[in-house]
Amino acid sequence: MTVNIYDDANQMATNLQTLPQFLGLQNAFAALKKDDIAFTMFKKFQTQQMTLQQKQMQGEELTDDEIQEIQELAQKIGDIDAIKNLMEQERQLSQLMDELNQIISKPIADIYQG
């Protein structure tokens, strides 16, 4: 019997889209997009976060001003209900993905522990 692991992965991706954790994230993001101010702040935060991560990956030090700016923006967006809901939905989906990764990776871990 030949196993096509990619078929299994594609089926898993399809199944994922029906789970409450995925649907919750999808709905939370749709709600966020309807709030122009919150969505604009969210996108600004994402852009700044990406810029700072790239800078760090290139071995550059972040300035105190950059750190303060991203912290202030994070605090502002953290007070917005639509963003809080999105973050909670992301956390729930991330927890599920971590559990799935542990299941999938178990045979590899078993090799090293055996």
UniProtKB/Swiss-Prot annotation:
SUPFAM superfamilies: YheA/YmcA-like
Highest taxon of source: Bacteria
InterPro entries found in the cross-reference section: Com_YlbF (IPR010368), YheA/YmcA-like_dom_sf (IPR023378)
UniProt family annotation: Belongs to the UPF0342 family.
Protein name, per record: UPF0342 protein LCA_0622
Naturally occurring in which organism (per UniProt): Latilactobacillus sakei subsp. sakei (strain 23K)
